């Protein structure tokens, strides 16, 4: 039996990464599950005139000529799945005390629950990536099980996606004399509503904070903006509230996802996002396409978890969670995305 260096285990730590669905929690608070495979935008209150621009992707290229506008859409279907291998129940779990070993039935239950947590996390990462991309670009590429990838374009105005260049780069400004406040106010004019929050990635925040004017103006005290403070409190270990810059909250987001075993940041380096915590982000979901779910009367649901066995020689057991997520912005111009340089 494989043993740790100490006979008595005091703690067992899973390999963790900084996943925290900040954009979902801050900007996507409404949820609309549908009983149909398609999401119908006209059935969402206040979105009668909204349409998505949908273009297929072939060999990595967006084919605009074959795309078009639609008010009904088929979300990609995701269904992460694991097998519960009987051999796994015979081995000690990482946090199991070697001097007080559990029985295989207990280990099986633990493995099933861990599988479900991993599957939920896999789907949540897809949702957060859609939400971040919607805010950053006003569009994203959607993929799913047996689903040809398509680009979902919410119609963001080009002026709301800004790249610093031509002498406007903050990295070229004198950090002791230059005040970036005027730049931020100019960027904010492109938003369709009031800006009350700015989200930076860590490198973007370091660049912003390098200006003396920023350090002088940043108010790190709490309590003066109660509603906004409520929105950004208890943000988690992947999010840091830095203070108020005038009447705008400054937040730094270092959330990560895992792709092919590699940890990656949701926000690109040197990103600044101007937005509003009251922006109307929508979590929409197509129906669950599973006969067992239909028999149970579960059609309109963000998730459908299942655990089942197949007969045979030998019998096999699996876990899976199914979902058809599509994150949308009612008004993509409520946000302004700036690539700092």
Which residues does each predicted region cover?
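N-terminal alpha-helical "arm" segments
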Residues: 1-41, 332-341
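Hydrophobic alpha-helical segments and helix pairs
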Residues: 3-20, 147-177
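Short, Φ-rich (hydrophobic/aromatic) sequence segments
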Residues: 13-14, 182-187, 327
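Pocket-edge structural micro-motifs
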Residues: 21, 42-45, 51-56, 275-276, ...
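Assembly/oligomerization interface modules of large self-assembling protein complexes
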Residues: 30-98
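Long, contiguous amphipathic alpha-helices that act as assembly "spine/axial" helices in icosahedral shell
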Residues: 80-157, 180-183, 187-204, 315-321
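Acidic/histidine-enriched, beta-strand-rich ligand/metal-binding domains
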Residues: 169-198, 202-211, 215-219, 225-230, ...
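Sequence/fold signature of self-assembling virion shell proteins
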Residues: 215-341
